[in-house]
Amino acid sequence: MKKKASLSEEDQTLFRQLMVGTRQIKQDTIVHRPQRKKITEVPTRRLIQEQADASHYFSDEFQPLLNTEGPVKYVREDVSHFELKKMRRGDYSPELFLDLHGLTQLQAKQELGALITACRREHIFCACVMHGHGKHILKQQTPLWLAQHPHVMAFHQAPKEYGGDAALLVLIEVEEWQPPELP
Protein backbone atom coordinates (compact mmCIF):
# COMPACT_ATOMS: atom_id res chain seq x y z
CA MET A 1 0.00 0.00 0.00
CA LYS A 2 1.43 3.40 -0.99
CA LYS A 3 1.81 6.22 1.49
CA LYS A 4 0.08 9.45 0.71
CA ALA A 5 2.39 12.20 -0.42
CA SER A 6 2.91 14.65 2.42
CA LEU A 7 2.86 18.37 1.82
CA SER A 8 6.07 20.30 2.05
CA GLU A 9 6.56 22.94 4.78
CA GLU A 10 6.00 25.70 2.21
CA ASP A 11 2.71 24.21 1.04
CA GLN A 12 1.47 23.77 4.60
CA THR A 13 2.36 27.38 5.48
CA LEU A 14 0.69 28.66 2.32
CA PHE A 15 -2.46 26.64 3.10
CA ARG A 16 -2.66 28.02 6.66
CA GLN A 17 -2.24 31.61 5.38
CA LEU A 18 -5.05 31.14 2.88
CA MET A 19 -7.36 29.70 5.54
CA VAL A 20 -6.90 32.58 7.99
CA GLY A 21 -10.27 34.17 8.75
CA THR A 22 -12.34 31.15 7.75
CA ARG A 23 -14.43 29.20 10.17
CA GLN A 24 -15.77 25.71 10.11
CA ILE A 25 -19.28 25.35 8.66
CA LYS A 26 -21.80 24.16 11.17
CA GLN A 27 -23.91 21.48 9.50
CA ASP A 28 -27.31 21.34 11.22
CA THR A 29 -29.82 20.99 8.40
CA ILE A 30 -29.53 17.28 7.67
CA VAL A 31 -30.03 14.67 10.34
CA HIS A 32 -28.02 11.54 9.70
CA ARG A 33 -29.93 8.53 10.95
CA PRO A 34 -28.07 5.32 11.61
CA GLN A 35 -28.57 2.75 8.89
CA ARG A 36 -30.63 -0.24 9.89
CA LYS A 37 -30.43 -3.75 8.55
CA LYS A 38 -33.00 -4.57 5.92
CA ILE A 39 -35.75 -6.57 7.56
CA THR A 40 -37.38 -7.45 4.23
CA GLU A 41 -34.75 -10.09 3.49
CA VAL A 42 -36.05 -12.58 6.04
CA PRO A 43 -39.70 -12.56 4.84
CA THR A 44 -38.48 -12.74 1.24
CA ARG A 45 -36.48 -15.87 2.03
CA ARG A 46 -39.48 -17.35 3.82
CA LEU A 47 -41.77 -16.65 0.84
CA ILE A 48 -39.30 -18.21 -1.58
CA GLN A 49 -39.10 -21.29 0.65
CA GLU A 50 -42.91 -21.52 0.85
CA GLN A 51 -43.18 -21.30 -2.94
CA ALA A 52 -40.52 -23.97 -3.38
CA ASP A 53 -42.29 -26.23 -0.88
CA ALA A 54 -45.64 -25.76 -2.61
CA SER A 55 -44.19 -26.44 -6.07
CA HIS A 56 -42.88 -29.86 -4.93
CA TYR A 57 -46.45 -31.16 -5.18
CA PHE A 58 -46.47 -30.71 -8.94
CA SER A 59 -45.03 -33.66 -10.84
CA ASP A 60 -44.94 -34.05 -14.61
CA GLU A 61 -44.70 -37.85 -14.38
CA PHE A 62 -47.88 -38.37 -12.35
CA GLN A 63 -51.02 -38.24 -14.49
CA PRO A 64 -54.22 -38.10 -12.41
CA LEU A 65 -57.35 -39.48 -14.02
CA LEU A 66 -59.41 -36.49 -15.11
CA ASN A 67 -62.52 -36.33 -17.24
CA THR A 68 -61.41 -35.62 -20.83
CA GLU A 69 -64.90 -34.94 -22.18
CA GLY A 70 -66.68 -31.68 -21.58
CA PRO A 71 -65.31 -28.90 -19.39
CA VAL A 72 -62.20 -29.48 -17.30
CA LYS A 73 -63.24 -30.32 -13.75
CA TYR A 74 -62.00 -32.05 -10.64
CA VAL A 75 -63.30 -32.56 -7.13
CA ARG A 76 -61.40 -34.17 -4.27
CA GLU A 77 -62.98 -37.31 -2.80
CA ASP A 78 -63.91 -35.68 0.52
CA VAL A 79 -65.58 -32.66 -1.14
CA SER A 80 -69.20 -32.57 -2.31
CA HIS A 81 -69.85 -32.68 -6.07
CA PHE A 82 -72.32 -29.87 -5.48
CA GLU A 83 -69.29 -27.54 -5.21
CA LEU A 84 -68.55 -28.20 -8.90
CA LYS A 85 -72.10 -27.26 -9.81
CA LYS A 86 -71.82 -24.02 -7.83
CA MET A 87 -68.53 -23.22 -9.57
CA ARG A 88 -70.04 -23.90 -13.00
CA ARG A 89 -73.04 -21.66 -12.25
CA GLY A 90 -70.76 -18.84 -11.14
CA ASP A 91 -71.80 -18.86 -7.48
CA TYR A 92 -68.16 -18.39 -6.51
CA SER A 93 -66.33 -15.26 -7.54
CA PRO A 94 -62.54 -15.44 -7.37
CA GLU A 95 -60.76 -13.04 -5.08
CA LEU A 96 -57.31 -13.70 -6.52
CA PHE A 97 -56.25 -14.07 -10.17
CA LEU A 98 -53.13 -15.69 -11.59
CA ASP A 99 -52.13 -15.15 -15.21
CA LEU A 100 -49.77 -17.82 -16.56
CA HIS A 101 -49.46 -16.36 -20.08
CA GLY A 102 -45.89 -16.43 -21.36
CA LEU A 103 -44.47 -18.47 -18.46
CA THR A 104 -42.42 -21.63 -18.76
CA GLN A 105 -43.66 -24.81 -17.10
CA LEU A 106 -41.22 -24.38 -14.22
CA GLN A 107 -42.28 -20.76 -13.69
CA ALA A 108 -45.95 -21.77 -13.89
CA LYS A 109 -45.44 -24.45 -11.21
CA GLN A 110 -43.76 -21.92 -8.93
CA GLU A 111 -46.53 -19.37 -9.47
CA LEU A 112 -49.22 -21.98 -8.78
CA GLY A 113 -47.46 -22.90 -5.56
CA ALA A 114 -47.24 -19.22 -4.62
CA LEU A 115 -50.94 -18.73 -5.41
CA ILE A 116 -52.01 -21.62 -3.19
CA THR A 117 -49.74 -20.40 -0.39
CA ALA A 118 -51.08 -16.84 -0.70
CA CYS A 119 -54.69 -18.06 -0.68
CA ARG A 120 -54.11 -20.08 2.47
CA ARG A 121 -52.32 -17.22 4.20
CA GLU A 122 -55.00 -14.67 3.27
CA HIS A 123 -57.93 -17.10 3.82
CA ILE A 124 -59.05 -16.82 0.19
CA PHE A 125 -60.93 -19.95 -0.86
CA CYS A 126 -61.61 -19.19 -4.55
CA ALA A 127 -59.01 -18.16 -7.11
CA CYS A 128 -58.87 -17.98 -10.90
CA VAL A 129 -55.92 -19.39 -12.85
CA MET A 130 -55.72 -18.10 -16.42
CA HIS A 131 -53.59 -20.50 -18.46
CA GLY A 132 -54.66 -19.24 -21.88
CA HIS A 133 -54.79 -21.20 -25.12
CA GLY A 134 -51.32 -20.84 -26.63
CA LYS A 135 -49.73 -24.14 -27.60
CA HIS A 136 -51.99 -25.97 -25.12
CA ILE A 137 -49.02 -26.99 -22.95
CA LEU A 138 -50.07 -25.03 -19.86
CA LYS A 139 -53.72 -25.65 -20.67
CA GLN A 140 -53.10 -29.40 -20.41
CA GLN A 141 -50.62 -29.35 -17.53
CA THR A 142 -52.33 -26.89 -15.16
CA PRO A 143 -55.28 -29.19 -14.28
CA LEU A 144 -52.89 -32.13 -13.80
CA TRP A 145 -50.74 -30.11 -11.40
CA LEU A 146 -53.71 -28.73 -9.46
CA ALA A 147 -55.22 -32.21 -9.00
CA GLN A 148 -52.00 -33.31 -7.26
CA HIS A 149 -51.95 -30.58 -4.62
CA PRO A 150 -53.48 -31.61 -1.27
CA HIS A 151 -54.94 -28.14 -0.58
CA VAL A 152 -56.88 -27.95 -3.87
CA MET A 153 -60.43 -29.06 -3.12
CA ALA A 154 -61.89 -28.65 -6.59
CA PHE A 155 -61.52 -26.81 -9.87
CA HIS A 156 -63.74 -26.22 -12.86
CA GLN A 157 -63.50 -24.46 -16.18
CA ALA A 158 -64.21 -20.80 -15.48
CA PRO A 159 -67.42 -19.07 -16.57
CA LYS A 160 -67.11 -16.74 -19.57
CA GLU A 161 -66.68 -13.60 -17.43
CA TYR A 162 -63.52 -15.07 -15.85
CA GLY A 163 -61.91 -16.46 -19.01
CA GLY A 164 -64.05 -19.40 -20.14
CA ASP A 165 -62.05 -22.39 -21.36
CA ALA A 166 -58.78 -20.44 -21.04
CA ALA A 167 -59.09 -20.31 -17.24
CA LEU A 168 -59.91 -22.42 -14.20
CA LEU A 169 -61.74 -21.54 -11.00
CA VAL A 170 -59.98 -23.22 -8.09
CA LEU A 171 -61.34 -23.89 -4.59
CA ILE A 172 -58.52 -23.96 -2.07
CA GLU A 173 -58.77 -25.48 1.36
CA VAL A 174 -58.15 -22.87 4.01
CA GLU A 175 -58.34 -23.42 7.73
CA GLU A 176 -61.89 -23.34 9.10
CA TRP A 177 -63.35 -22.93 5.60
CA GLN A 178 -67.10 -23.24 5.25
CA PRO A 179 -68.87 -22.86 1.90
CA PRO A 180 -71.00 -19.71 1.77
CA GLU A 181 -74.70 -20.24 2.18
CA LEU A 182 -76.85 -19.54 -0.84
CA PRO A 183 -79.92 -17.29 -0.51
Swiss-Prot record:
Membrane-spanning intervals of the chain: none
Uppermost EC category: hydrolase
Keywords: Endonuclease, Hydrolase, Nuclease, RNA-binding, rRNA-binding
Example GO biological process: rescue of stalled ribosome
UniProt-listed Enzyme Commission number(s): 3.1.-.-
GO molecular-function term, one example from the UniProt record: rRNA binding
Residue ranges annotated for the Smr domain, each copy included: 98-173
InterPro entries: Smr_dom, Smr_dom_sf, SmrB-like
Family statement drawn from the similarity comment of this UniProt entry: Belongs to the SmrB family.
HAMAP family xrefs: SmrB
Quaternary assembly: Associates with collided ribosomes, but not with correctly translating polysomes.
Family annotation (NCBIfam families): PRK04946.1 (NF003432)
Reported function: Acts as a ribosome collision sensor. Detects stalled/collided disomes (pairs of ribosomes where the leading ribosome is stalled and a second ribosome has collided with it) and endonucleolytically cleaves mRNA at the 5' boundary of the stalled ribosome. Stalled/collided disomes form a new interface (primarily via the 30S subunits) that binds SmrB. Cleaved mRNA becomes available for tmRNA ligation, leading to ribosomal subunit dissociation and rescue of stalled ribosomes.
PANTHER family named among the record's database cross-references: DNA ENDONUCLEASE SMRA-RELATED, UPF0115 PROTEIN YFCN
Protein name: Ribosome rescue factor SmrB
Name of the encoding gene: smrB
